[in-house]
A protein has these predicted regions:
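Hydrophobic helix-and-loop "lid/oligomerization" segment in the mid-to-C-terminal part
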Residues: 1-98, 103-135
Length: 135
């Protein structure tokens, strides 16, 4: 249990502060089936944290009732890291591949250095629009 607790049940105060700031910026789309956030340097600085403190955030957002797909766009030093998670209704590794990344059907990611956070988010939502059934 000690190893499990150290790995999965301990969060630093910086992580909690960053999670709190990220939740304030969380956006929902497609009848709340998709949620995501851009975790900018500004948000990270406000929390006294950095991009390394976002571990588990995408899984947390995916756990919100009704959410099928969650994404986090994390600003790093000179690029953005994108994390995707799906509950299984929608496959998301093709979205990561469209950014030069990869992964599994339900958990994938990419790094991007030639687009802004909002440009990345716009592209994600355009791709998801073709997948998500909003009826």
């Amino acid at each position: 249990y000690d190893v499990y607790e150290k790995l999965y049940e301990r969060r630093s105060l910086y992580q909690i502060k960053l999670l709190s700031e990220s939740i304030k910026e969380l956006k929902f789309n497609f009848n709340k089936q998709v949620c995501g956030v851009i975790i900018s340097k500004e948000i990270q600085n406000k929390a006294g944290a950095n991009y390394e403190h976002v571990e588990g955030f995408t899984d947390f957002f995916r756990s919100i009732e009704g959410v099928q797909v969650a994404y986090c766009i994390i600003e790093q030093n000179y690029s953005y890291r994108i994390n995707f998670r799906s509950r299984g209704k929608y496959i998301i590794n093709d979205i990561a591949k469209s950014f030069g990344g990869g992964g599994h059907k339900l958990a994938a990611g990419a790094s991007v250095d030639n687009l802004s956070g909002s440009e990345i988010e716009d592209k994600i939502l355009r791709i998801l629009k073709g997948k998500i059934n909003v009826n």
